């Protein structure tokens, strides 16, 4: 899979259905929780730490589900959804590398919000730059991420951690 460098919306939906990386491996959430429309670039090299990166975009439309409820009269995309997008991309990258197991967000270091996504925003861009991928009982990706709204940096997160485990989330 590491040969492909971009993914369109239909391919992301295939990943959400468990069809992209094989049964029992990394999946994206299905809409409306899928927080990007395309992956524009993914690479095992480059990025801020020269250990790989992933970039994605989300087209913002005024009728997106979260604007109707967060907040009435003051619509704003919840910050946690932007953070979740960064975790989603981190897990996708691990699956793209061919690592086995289901993904789970584990933690993040510091998160800073410097702006908001409102219905007037046209496009959100995400970037995740990998610091390390650890392979053991659990595959662990550690990365820093950022988010831009119409080209302006608005979120930054350090030490995003996502793990892949062969164990089911259902006990």
From Swiss-Prot:
Matching Pfam families, A to Z? FabA
Q: Which organism is it from?
A: Mesorhizobium japonicum (strain LMG 29417 / CECT 9101 / MAFF 303099) (Mesorhizobium loti (strain MAFF 303099))
Q: Report the GO molecular function annotations.
A: (3R)-hydroxyacyl-[acyl-carrier-protein] dehydratase activity; trans-2-decenoyl-acyl-carrier-protein isomerase activity
Query: What is the annotated quaternary arrangement, including any partners?
Result: Homodimer.
**Source species taxonomy:** Bacteria, Pseudomonadati, Pseudomonadota, Alphaproteobacteria, Hyphomicrobiales
The UniProt entry's GO CC annotations, sorted and at most eight, read: cytoplasm
**Localization per record:** Cytoplasm
Listed name of the protein: 3-hydroxydecanoyl-[acyl-carrier-protein] dehydratase
Q: Which PANTHER family match?
A: 3-HYDROXYACYL-[ACYL-CARRIER-PROTEIN] DEHYDRATASE (PTHR30272), 3-HYDROXYDECANOYL-[ACYL-CARRIER-PROTEIN] DEHYDRATASE (PTHR30272:SF8)
* InterPro entries cross-referenced by the UniProt entry: FabA, FabA_FabZ, HotDog_dom_sf
Quote the Gene3D superfamilies the UniProt record gives: Hotdog Thioesterase
């Amino acid at each position: 899979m590491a040969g492909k460098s971009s993914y369109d919306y239909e391919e992301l939906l295939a990943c959400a259905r468990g069809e992209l990386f094989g049964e029992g491996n990394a999946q994206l959430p299905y809409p409306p929780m899928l927080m990007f429309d395309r992956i524009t670039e993914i690479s095992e090299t480059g990025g801020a730490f020269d250990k790989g990166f992933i970039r994605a975009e989300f087209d913002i439309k005024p009728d997106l589900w979260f604007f109707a409820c967060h907040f009435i009269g003051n619509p704003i995309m919840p910050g946690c959804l932007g953070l979740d997008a960064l975790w989603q991309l981190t897990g996708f990258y691990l699956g793209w590398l061919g690592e086995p197991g289901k993904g789970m967000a584990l933690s993040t270091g510091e998160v800073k919000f410097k702006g908001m996504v409102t219905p007037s925003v046209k496009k959100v861009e995400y970037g995740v730059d990998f610091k390390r991928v650890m392979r053991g009982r659990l595959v662990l990706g550690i990365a820093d991420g950022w988010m831009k709204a119409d080209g302006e940096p608005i979120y930054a997160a350090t030490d995003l951690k996502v793990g892949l485990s062969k164990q089911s989330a259902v006990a």
